[in-house]
């Protein structure tokens, strides 16, 4: 037995150092951690249990003579803050982290386990794509991964962390997960690289411009979160996990409250500008209301006219959506609608209550928006709210105009509780536009159109642009003192804690994609 144990230990040692010294040095010289170093940093100390440590490729006819253990990816399970998670970490020092048949089988196994056990699946991506030498077998492996991403969708949280290159077909697995994290100047995602783009289209573009973290954080909306280095990004994943349940049958962890549930927020009374046309920062409202001012913002650099993210109220996770008057007056456009729709559906999938702060003057007008599909994109957000069965509370802080008001989780689309500040303006449209339509002839015949227009705007504001007409009809459940917003939200969530709602039986809804 002693000899057999020695042999086992030798094999394990070889697996622990599967990459060559040269490849390891090259990885470190780039300022990047090794696959095992990432797992060790991310998981609780001593909690990692590895799967398939001793597997090797069997592509004997592919011309690959080396057969290192692990085959370029580390898989297994462990804990983060005491909670079970499954993880894979691509090893760029072995075959460049490229995916072959055995590599894919390892991912299939760990993904199946995560889904059946009901624990989050975390993918640490740093690889060169498909292993060309293994041909179509690699493509079949990717297909199995994509299929499993879809089977796990809405069942367990799936988080992709891009720590190096992720190109070609390899990008589609992260794209189907719930969240994508990237590192500035280290992470790159694209279907076709700069050389192919140059050859096919003649466009000159750098790697960073085409598929860097900055581009995906600000332009494409692919990156949910972006950090400065690997350790920071892994720490941020841990923070996100703290807001999420392990699966769709559980609730998110409850944290012992460190903030008074009965805390008043008097600063909110002084936040709103006197002029309805002046902006204020919706993030301030959100952070003042949440426990300890802690707010993990989702897509903070993309579609900034709407704010989405996670926080807690009295120790319980909530998803927060809010129009941002600081950007384009908080209008809804194509990107904002898509961003918020994705966020709302993710919260609903994982039993996280939704708080929606409304200050929306409407949908962004323009030929580009219409031709780009604002009708279809706006419908995504409307669909997401109508479909959501989690507790939903709406808070109208100022403007709530037209169809955009309805879309932003109004009572008519199923919000459980609608609260309004005294500054709220619920109307079909803004006063200027309404006056132009309702009184066009009168203004044309007026001796002083400007003065008469101002009078009519004031009349409209007094009669319609307030929360009380809606409150009289029950479209708003209560008009509240802004200072009481936190107190009222916590009370509302406690009341809704036992809410149970089921959608009609169907194969699946037809989201306007």
Which residues fall in each region the model found?
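Ligand-binding clefts of soluble mixed alpha/beta catalytic domains
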Residues: 1-513
């Amino acid at each position: 037995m002693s000899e057999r144990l020695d042999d086992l230990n030798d094999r394990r040692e070889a697996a622990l150092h599967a990459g060559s010294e040269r490849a390891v040095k090259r990885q470190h010289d780039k300022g990047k951690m090794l696959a095992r170093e990432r797992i060790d940093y991310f998981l609780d100390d001593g909690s990692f249990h590895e799967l398939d440590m001793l597997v090797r490729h069997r592509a004997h006819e592919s011309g690959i003579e080396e057969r290192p253990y692990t085959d370029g990816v580390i898989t297994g399970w462990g804990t983060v803050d005491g909670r079970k998670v499954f993880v894979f970490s691509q090893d760029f020092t072995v075959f460049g982290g490229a995916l072959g048949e055995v590599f894919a089988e390892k991912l299939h196994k760990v993904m199946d386990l995560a889904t059946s056990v009901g624990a989050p699946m975390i993918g640490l991506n740093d690889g060169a794509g498909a292993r060309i030498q293994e041909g179509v077998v690699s493509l079949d492996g990717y297909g199995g991964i994509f299929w499993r991403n879809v089977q796990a969708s809405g069942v367990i949280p799936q988080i992709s962390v891009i720590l190096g290159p992720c190109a070609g077909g390899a990008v589609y697995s992260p794209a189907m997960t719930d969240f994508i994290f990237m590192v500035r100047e280290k992470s790159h995602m694209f279907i076709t690289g700069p050389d192919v783009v140059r050859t096919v289209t003649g466009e000159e573009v750098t790697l960073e411009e085409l598929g860097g973290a900055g581009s995906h954080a600000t332009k494409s909306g692919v990156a949910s979160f972006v950090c400065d280095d690997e350790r920071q990004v892994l720490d941020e994943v841990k923070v996100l996990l703290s807001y999420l349940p392990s699966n769709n049958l559980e609730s998110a962890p409850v944290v012992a409250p460190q903030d008074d549930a009965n805390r008043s927020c008097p600063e909110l009374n002084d936040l709103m500008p006197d002029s309805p046309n002046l902006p204020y920062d919706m993030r301030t409202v959100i952070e003042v209301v949440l426990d300890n001012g802690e707010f993990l913002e989702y897509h903070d650099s993309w579609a900034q006219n709407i704010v989405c993210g996670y926080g807690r109220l009295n120790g319980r996770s909530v998803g927060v959506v809010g129009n941002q008057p600081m950007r384009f007056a908080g209008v809804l456009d194509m990107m904002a609608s898509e961003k918020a729709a994705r966020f709302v559906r993710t919260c609903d999938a994982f039993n996280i209550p939704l708080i929606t702060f409304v200050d929306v003057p409407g949908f962004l007008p323009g030929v580009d928006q219409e031709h780009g599909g604002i009708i279809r994109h706006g419908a995504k957000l409307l669909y997401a709210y109508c479909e959501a069965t989690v507790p939903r509370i709406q808070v109208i802080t100022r403007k709530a105009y037209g169809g955009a008001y309805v879309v932003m989780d109004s009572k008519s689309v199923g919000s459980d509780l609608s609260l309004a500040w005294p500054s709220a303006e619920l109307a079909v449209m803004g006063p200027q536009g309404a006056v132009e339509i309702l009184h066009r002839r009168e203004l044309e015949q007026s001796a002083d159109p400007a003065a008469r227009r101002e009078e009519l705007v004031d009349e409209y504001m007094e009669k319609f642009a307030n929360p009380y007409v809606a409150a009289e009809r029950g479209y708003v459940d209560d008009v509240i003192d802004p200072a009481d917003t936190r107190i009222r939200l916590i009370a509302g969530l406690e009341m809704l804690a036992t809410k149970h709602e089921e959608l009609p039986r169907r194969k699946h809804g037809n989201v306007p994609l």
